């Protein structure tokens, strides 16, 4: 069975994702720019009302993934505030200006999250060298990488995703994301070998259809 993670912005969307059968929730603000950190109040409400594993986006703004010291301070504060609220994990990522993983910043961010699973988000799709970047993410101890293979969609990036799955082995989970729908999900899985997929909740039916295809029910 392939795990389905639904990206949501509101309590209503989180509840809809749960009803639709999603296995995990990624809670964000501003999904139009790829997601930013949601408020502590929203995090608490979703965790309390949904009763599903909730991963929280830690990202101070849209745009690139190269962060100044004050932005990193804000991200650390957000992790400190989110952790006691019962979250299941965090979703984050930081790059250097040369397109490599910012290992120092990632270590800093992962320190207060110790014990929580960490997803390295789609900042991975703009790294200069995916093979090298994946090894850095593995060495950091992240639980999974969310990627479209550097393409506009997971289907378009299927070859690259499959290569990452092979490289990762059992060391880290590769989660495919990028316009995965009920209509193309089986093709994405067959071409990549991923065991987890990530999809934006467009409506309850969109996730329900995806779950039906991937859970076989």
Regions found by a protein language model. Name each.
Residues 1-25, 30-33:
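N-terminal pre-domain/capping segments
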Residues 4-8, 25-27, 54-58, 90-92, ...:
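Hydrophobic faces of well-ordered beta-strands that scaffold small-molecule active sites
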Residues 9-20, 66-81, 118, 125-140, ...:
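Catalytic cores of alpha/beta
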Residues 10-12, 29-31, 60-62, 96, ...:
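Active-site-proximal loop/turn and secondary-structure-junction residues that shape catalytic pockets
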Residues 11-13, 24, 37, 43-103:
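Active-site beta->alpha loop and helix N-cap motifs at the rims of alpha/beta catalytic domains
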Residues 25-36, 81-97, 140-157, 192-210:
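Glycine-rich phosphate-binding active-site loops on the catalytic face of alpha/beta enzymes
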Residues 35-62, 100-123, 156-182, 207-217:
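Alpha-helix-loop-beta-strand connector modules within alpha/beta enzyme cores
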């Amino acid at each position: 069975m392939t795990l389905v993670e639904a990206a949501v912005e509101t309590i209503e969307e989180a509840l809809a994702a749960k009803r639709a059968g999603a296995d995990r929730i990624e809670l964000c603000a501003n999904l139009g720019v790829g997601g930013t950190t949601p408020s502590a109040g929203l995090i608490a409400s979703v965790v309390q009302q949904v009763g599903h594993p909730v991963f929280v986006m830690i990202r101070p703004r849209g745009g690139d993934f190269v962060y100044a010291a004050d932005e990193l301070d804000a991200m650390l504060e957000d992790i400190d505030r989110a952790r006691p609220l019962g979250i299941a994990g965090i979703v984050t990522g930081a790059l250097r200006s040369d397109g490599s993983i910012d290992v120092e910043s990632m270590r800093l961010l992962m320190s207060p999250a110790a014990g929580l699973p960490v997803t390295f988000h789609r900042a991975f799709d703009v790294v200069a060298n995916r093979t090298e970047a994946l090894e850095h993410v593995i060495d950091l101890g992240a639980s999974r990488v969310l990627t479209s293979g550097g393409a506009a969609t997971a289907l378009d990036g299927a070859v690259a995703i499959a290569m990452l799955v092979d490289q990762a082995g059992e060391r880290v989970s590769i989660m495919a994301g990028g316009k995965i729908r009920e209509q193309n999900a089986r093709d994405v899985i067959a071409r990549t070998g991923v065991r987890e997929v990530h999809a934006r909740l467009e409506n309850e039916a969109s996730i329900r259809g995806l779950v039906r295809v991937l859970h076989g029910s």
